[in-house]
From Swiss-Prot:
A lipid is attached at G2 (N-myristoyl glycine). The keyword DNA-binding applies. One of its GO terms (molecular function) is structural molecule activity. GO terms for cellular component: host cell; host cell endoplasmic reticulum membrane; host cell nucleus; membrane; viral capsid. Disulfide bonds: none annotated. Pfam families: Polyoma_coat2. Residues 310-341 are annotated as: Disordered. Residues 302-341 are annotated as: DNA-binding. This is Minor capsid protein VP2. InterPro entries: Polyoma_coat_VP2.
Amino acid sequence: MGAIISAIAGLFELGALGGLAVDAAVNTAEIEAFIGELVLQDFSVAEIFDAIETSGIPLANTAVPVAELQQTAATSGLIGQALSAPSLIAASVKAFAGDPVAAGNNMALQVWRDQMDILFPGAEWFSNAVHNINPLAWAQSLYEQVGQSIWNYMTGNIGQAVIHQIEERTTALIVYQSRGIYDILARALETARWTLTTAAVDTYQTLKSYYGELPAVSGRVEAFRRYHEVAQGRSFFEDSDIQDVLEGKKAQKRIEGPQEMTGQTIEQQTPPGGAMQRHANDWLLPLILGLYGDLTPEWRYQLKERLNVPKRKRKLPTTSAGTSPPSKRRYRGVRRKVRSR
């Protein structure tokens, strides 16, 4: 009902703007609708005019010229439907509801669109996607079409570039941190206190102190004392003597105290020249240079000798020129040149 009222109001507005009467507009609408039906039924122009005259619709009351009616009947026959708002919306929806897959296929059966990627990347897709945007829901369709393309571009090109940059930065950071660790280790070796020790002497000293601190076995001491009493008729070791020996060892241990120094400490020299530059001993220099990736000439020469060892050539047996190899033919003795028959 609301659509009918809006259509009647639209007719009154058209009549007021164009200077037409309401009945003329109504008659014109009837004629256009009638012509549209005849055109859809494949009638010719003469048959359409004959049908209009026989139907009793007065042409004099209409403001549409006969030539315009002929053009309308010959071309579309749907002027009334095309001028209405619902028909415009339906036509636009039909025009814009194309298949995006078919729009991208530039085949002979499809509408040809020139390549537009020479302007900027993605121009061809955008020109094809414009025809697939729904005017009734343009925001949602635009977001779906353009947003998906942007996401594909970011995950494809930009994503790979970002991943490549992250890998490069991570590798550079690892190399920088490793160099920093090597530098800290080299500086710690330069400022450390070095002590010269001998492992064999320390081992024997440890064993001597260990066995010296063991408690005396009463059974062995008693047996040793009885052996000497029987052999010499008197005791060489009294209980008081044994106790004095044990107490003397304990007193000596208290006086000496724990051994703090386990070797000879190497004296640390001050930087020469007074400029406080970095310095190291000669025996420590190859280790520090190796941490920084440099090699001393002696070390480089030794590595070169170990890596470039020539392969041993196979020795073939050689024979002297004067001696000939022995013949394997057996000796048959001396024969005459002329034989008798």
